[in-house]
Every structure is written in structure tokens, then in C-alpha cells.
A protein has these predicted regions:
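N-terminal beta1-alpha1 ligand-phosphate binding loop
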Residues: 1-27
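Short glycine-rich anion-binding loops that position phosphate/pyrophosphate groups of nucleotides
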Residues: 11, 78-81, 109-112
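Short Lys/Arg-rich amphipathic alpha-helical segments
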Residues: 14, 21-24, 33, 45, ...
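A short beta-strand-loop structural module common to alpha/beta enzyme folds
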Residues: 29-42
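Short, well-ordered alpha-helix to beta-strand connector turns
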Residues: 31, 70-71, 121
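S-adenosyl-L-methionine/SAH cofactor-binding core of RNA-modifying enzymes
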Residues: 39-103
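Structured adenosyl-cofactor binding patch, chiefly the S-adenosyl-L-methionine
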Residues: 111, 115-159
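Single conserved hydrophobic/aromatic residue that forms the stacking wall/gate
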Residues: 160-171
């Protein structure tokens, strides 16, 4: 299985990068993980709806160019489906059983997602009613992917200790 994270914008805070690296390290014994960051497009001050739409389409094009047609695309979107950790784990397991091995998790920039990337999404996923920065959303996504893998392997999700690679292997 492979999780490819595609994101607009870079993680600037060291503590967020370290958190993402930690969850990535925890996932790697059982899942291939890669991240590709694309630069945000410049948004003018007080943009019209048309200008904002064009900027979002450009960012969407950047994300779409980085994926293969055969992968399953999950778009983080505030209007997406709200699921529990267990439901996300079950969805990933179901897609895997149906033959999906590559999941693309797409995170737009601070202004949202263009219609082009929304149209390509196999699942639009919401992190709930609260709003997070796109940087924080990435950290939370990594934690939830780690949790989903642990749930699907019927293993406890140890939050405050670093598991050894042995802890991540299938039983």
C-alpha cells in the first residue's frame, strides 16, 4: 500500500515538520509514504470570485499533474464527508480489498480547492466542523492515517511512545 500526500504550501513550523516526520516514520514499516509540496499561487488582495477561482484552478492543476490515473484520490475539503477514525480505516481496508493500492491525499491551499481537483476526487473528506490551517490539516491527516493502519492491523494506537518497527508488522 502507498500513501501519497500532495499539498499546496510548505510546512514552515519545525514542530509540525517533526510531527509529520514521526508519523511518516511510524507508517513506513507497513506503508510506502511520499510527500510532494507545491507552491501556493499568489492571491491578490480582495480578489473577485473569478480571480479566486482561477487561482484555485491553477493550484488544482499542480496537484493533478502529480498523480497517476490508477490511484484513489482523497481530497481534504471542509464540505466533505465527516467520518470517524474507524470509518476511515474501514474505507481504506475496503478499497484495498477491491484492489486499490495507491491512495493520494490532496490538501489544497488556504483558500480551498478548485473545481478541477474536486471533480477528480474519489472521496471528499472533512476533518469535522472546525477549521484548521492547511499545514495543521497535514499533521492531523498523518496522525489519522497512522491510526487507520493500526486499527486495520488490530493493534493499539500508542500515542505517547515511539513504536519499534516490530510493533508495526502484521501479526
Amino acid at each position: 500500500m502507498r500513501f501519497s500526500i500532495r499539498a499546496i504550501g510548505k510546512i514552515k513550523e519545525k514542530w509540525m515538520r517533526e510531527g509529520i516526520e514521526e508519523y511518516s516514520k511510524r507508517l513506513k514499516p507497513v506503508v510506502k509514504v511520499d510527500v510532494l509540496e507545491s507552491d501556493e499561487e499568489k492571491m491578490p488582495e480582495n480578489p473577485s470570485a473569478a480571480v479566486k477561482g482561477k487561482v484555485l484552478e491553477k493550484e488544482g492543476e499542480k496537484l493533478l499533474r502529480s498523480i497517476q490515473d490508477s490511484g484513489c484520490v482523497v481530497l481534504l475539503d471542509m464540505n466533505g464527508k465527516k467520518v470517524s477514525s474507524e470509518e476511515l480505516a474501514a474505507w481504506i481496508a475496503q478499497k484495498t480489498v477491491m484492489g486499490t493500492s495507491h491512495f493520494y491525499f490532496m490538501i489544497g491551499g488556504p483558500y480551498g480547492n478548485g473545481k478541477n481537483i474536486q471533480a477528480r476526487a474519489d472521496l471528499k473528506l472533512s476533518m469535522g466542523p472546525m477549521t484548521f490551517t492547511h499545514q495543521m490539516a497535514r499533521l492531523i491527516l498523518f496522525e489519522q492515517l497512522y491510526r487507520a493502519v493500526k486499527i486495520n492491523h488490530h493493534e493499539p494506537c500508542l500515542l505517547y511512545t515511539s513504536p519499534s518497527p516490530r510493533d508495526m508488522r502484521r501479526s
